Amino acid sequence: ASLPSTENTPSGYDNVQNTARGFDWRNDQPASIVYAMPLDSGYIKKKVPFHDAVFALEAPFNGTPKELFKTENRYSRTNWGNDQVALVSEQLRSKQQYKVSLYNSKSNTISTLYEGNSTDMYNNPGNPVTEKNSFGEEVLAISKDGQTIMFNNTTGASAKGDLPYLAKFNIQTKSKEILWR
C-alpha cells in the first residue's frame, strides 16, 4: 500500500491525514471492511456540510467501495448490530463534543440518537452491551422486536457518587430506563 507522508498531516485536534483511515471489519457481515475518508481535506475548520464519509468494501476487496453515510463531525467508530441497527459515533475533540446516531443500512438512513459533552460523566450513557453473532464477532445486543439496545455504565457517575448501572434504551423513542443500579 502506498500512503502519503504524515509530515504534511495538519496539526491540531480533529485534523486528520487526507487519506482513508479507521479501517475495521463490519462485524454484522461475513467479510466487509469499513473505513472513513475526510471530505474536508483533513482540515476540520473547513466549512463543509459533512467532514467525513464512511465506506464499505466487501470481499474479495477488489470492487468499488460503497458509501454508507456521512458525518457532520469527525467519524470515530461504528458499533454494528445488524442491517437495521448500528450506532455511529462521531466527535469534535477540540470542543469535547460527541454524537451517536442510529444507522440503518437496509434503508440507508442515519438519525441522531443522542449528543453530549465528553467531560459530562453524569449524562454518559455508558457502553453498548454486545453479544457474539454467527460469525463469532461482537455485535450490539438488540431486543427481538428491534427497538431496544442495552447500555452498561461501569462508573455511573451521579450526585450521590459512582453508582454503576445497566439500562435499556429505546431507539425509536430515544428513552432510557435504568434496570439496575
Mark where each language-model region is.
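Beta-propeller folds
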Residues: 1-181
